[in-house]
Amino acid sequence: MSAEEKNLIEILEEGHKVDVVKYIDYVSAPQAGAIATFSGTTRDMFEGKTVLELRYEAYVPMATRCLSSICTTARSTWDIHKIAVAHRLGPVPVGETSVLIAVSSVHRADGLDACKFLIDELKASVPIWKKEVYTNGEIWKENSEFMEKRLELAEKRDSIVKKTVVEEHRRRGCCGSKVRVEEDEEHKDITGDNKSSS
């Protein structure tokens, strides 16, 4: 069974609930001594506001590709057997699951670390958007993980650009290693070291 066949990735259309047992059963295997799961559910309060439901939208083809890539990265980092990722679209009432991640592994540490990585990366980079609906209004939410990742990527990009500019300047510059400074013979001692002329 290839690594691709050991991943179950589903973006569930509106009206379909996350069947937690289905995904845990999928990752179960005799060689797996651990199954780590994360279940994200709609809570009833956020910053003092009463939440009625969350509503999710996604660019499904890209979301699926991103999740597949994240699973590949997890597999290359930890010794894991199977991965299941499910995310609902549409309204998700209070108390219901919107996202589930299940990871099976021989040992718990790999499963737990991979599970945390998968949910963090999902929230930071997968094109799934959330609207929080309150008793007194609604708002599209931007994940803090997404913003942190954008800042991190911008800092890396800026660092790479600066490094490239500096390297290019050094390579093409009129100074630096291309200029050879001839030392005045009277300022050298017999060992060849420079002497101060003060």
Curated annotation (Swiss-Prot):
Q: Where does substrate bind?
A: 107-108, 123, 130-132
* TM stretches of this protein: none
Q: GO annotations under biological process? A: Mo-molybdopterin cofactor biosynthetic process
Which pathway is this protein engaged in?
A: Cofactor biosynthesis; molybdopterin biosynthesis
Any single GO molecular-function term of the entry would be:
molybdopterin synthase activity
What reaction does this enzyme carry out catalytically?
Answer: 2 [molybdopterin-synthase sulfur-carrier protein]-C-terminal-Gly-aminoethanethioate + cyclic pyranopterin phosphate + H2O = molybdopterin + 2 [molybdopterin-synthase sulfur-carrier protein]-C-terminal Gly-Gly + 2 H(+)
Q: Hey, what's the signal peptide range on this chain?
A: none
CDD domains, sorted? MoaE (cd00756)
Can you list the disulfide-bonded cysteine pairs?
none
Record-linked InterPro entries: MoaE_sf (IPR036563), MOCS2B_euk (IPR028888), Mopterin_biosynth_MoaE (IPR003448)
Q: Which GO terms describe its cellular component?
A: molybdopterin synthase complex
What Gene3D superfamilies does the record point to? Molybdopterin biosynthesis MoaE subunit (3.90.1170.40)
Question: For this protein, what is the EC number?
Answer: 2.8.1.12
Ordered alphabetically, the record's keywords are: Cytoplasm, Molybdenum cofactor biosynthesis, Transferase
**Looking at its record, which EC class is this enzyme?**
transferase
Q: Indicate where this protein resides in the cell.
A: Cytoplasm
Q: Which Pfam families match?
A: MoaE
- Subunit composition? Heterotetramer; composed of 2 small (MOCS2A) and 2 large (MOCS2B) subunits.
Primary role: Catalytic subunit of the molybdopterin synthase complex, a complex that catalyzes the conversion of precursor Z into molybdopterin. Acts by mediating the incorporation of 2 sulfur atoms from thiocarboxylated MOCS2A into precursor Z to generate a dithiolene group.
> What does the sequence similarity comment in the record state about its family?
Belongs to the MoaE family. MOCS2B subfamily.
The name under which this protein is listed is Molybdopterin synthase catalytic subunit
